[in-house]
């Protein structure tokens, strides 16, 4: 299965990424900064926002697993920009690309 993963550089996302690769899935993962090469992973430089290269992340994906989220922000607007607007942007990109499966993981209550 071709998976697109956000938040793959965080604690939960990194474990998910490693498990997906170990299970033989092809993974495309979003990262704000360059990452070390990992066999089976294509890194897409971008961010969780409407201009964040999300179309490239989700193109051809069978499923999107959205793990990215702000757990520390300077203010309420900072949380909203990532956790609300960013989530809406990745959902829209996935819908526009015809992705049939979308999993949203969130650790904030």
Residue ranges and their predicted role:
Residues 2-4, 77-78:
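Short, contiguous strand/loop micro-motifs
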Residues 25-32:
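Conserved glycine-rich Rossmann-like NAD(P)H-binding loop of the short-chain dehydrogenase/reductase
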Residues 35-36, 41, 45-89, 93, ...:
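NAD(P)H-binding glycine-rich loop region in Rossmannoid oxidoreductase-like domains
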Residues 96-101:
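A short helix->loop->beta-strand "cap" motif at the edges of active sites that frequently abuts
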Residues 3, 16-19, 30, 54, ...:
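Generic leucine side-chain signal with a strong bias for well-ordered alpha-helical environments
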Residues 3-25:
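N-terminal Rossmann NAD(P)H-binding glycine-rich loop of SDR-like oxidoreductase domains
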Residues 6, 30, 64-68, 102-108:
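SDR active-site strand-loop-helix element
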């Amino acid at each position: 299965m071709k998976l697109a993963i956000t938040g793959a550089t965080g604690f939960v996302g990194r474990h998910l990424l490693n498990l997906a690769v170990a299970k033989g899935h092809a993974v495309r993962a979003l990262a704000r900064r360059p990452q070390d090469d990992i066999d089976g992973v294509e890194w897409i430089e971008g961010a969780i926002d409407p201009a964040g290269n999300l179309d490239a992340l989700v193109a051809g994906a069978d499923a999107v697993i959205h793990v990215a989220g702000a757990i520390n922000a300077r203010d309420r607007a900072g949380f909203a920009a990532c956790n609300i607007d960013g989530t809406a942007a990745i959902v829209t990109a996935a819908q526009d690309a015809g992705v049939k499966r979308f999993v949203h993981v969130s650790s904030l209550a």
